[in-house]
Amino acid sequence: MKWNDISKDQMKYDVTIPFIRQLAGPMDYTQGAMLNATKKDFYPCYFKPMSQGTRCHQLALYMILDSPLNMLCDSPTHYNKEIECTEFIASIPTVWNETRIIDGEVGEWIITARRNNSIWYVGGITNWTSRDVKLDLSFLPQGKYKIEIFKDGINADRNATDYKKDFFVTEDITKIHKLHLAPGGGFAMKIEGYLP
């Protein structure tokens, strides 16, 4: 799929496969591209391979797809230049105690939450349609949480590598209730219980 001609819609594939192929169990996907392109800017290039969609879309795939042997699809040089994203990817477990599909529609978008011990990882992606998604985290018990979130940057619709990282502590997890996803976009979040 990734090396096929430009007419292939990788974003639609990404928001379809979790609903169909994942029913059979874990799969290999090889996500994690650091060279990201908008629909307009993408082209197959052997010497400078890139992914369709935003950087946060790529990060979110680590939560959305169940793969106990995750890979990195890009050059080590690119990961060395993108330490913030690389460290986040390295922190994501490959085995889970619990999985919840929070919301989604086949071929449109999906939001998945996965728990490893007491830490939750939440990822959401969309097809080429930008959208505001509601994030229902009401399944989490009341308490104080430390949140790390990567979300599409304000210019991600023009520059797919643009993202914003936020880090904060909250006592009201429901405050994170709406996120904007750029075309081909996504978000990736780590939620840890927090004791002062």
Predicted regions and their residues:
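Glycan-recognition and catalytic regions of carbohydrate-active enzymes
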Residues: 74-121, 157-161
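Carbohydrate-binding surface patches
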Residues: 106-142, 187-188
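Glycan-recognition surfaces
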Residues: 1-76, 102
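Extended hydrophobic-aromatic, low-complexity segments
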Residues: 73, 123-124, 131-135, 145-148, ...
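Solvent-exposed beta-strand/loop surfaces of large extracellular or lumenal domains
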Residues: 149-174
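C-terminal beta-strand-rich structural cap/linker in extracellular carbohydrate-active enzymes
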Residues: 166-196
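Conserved, mostly hydrophobic/aromatic
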Residues: 64, 122, 184
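Active/binding-pocket-proximal capping segment
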Residues: 79-85, 128-131, 138-155
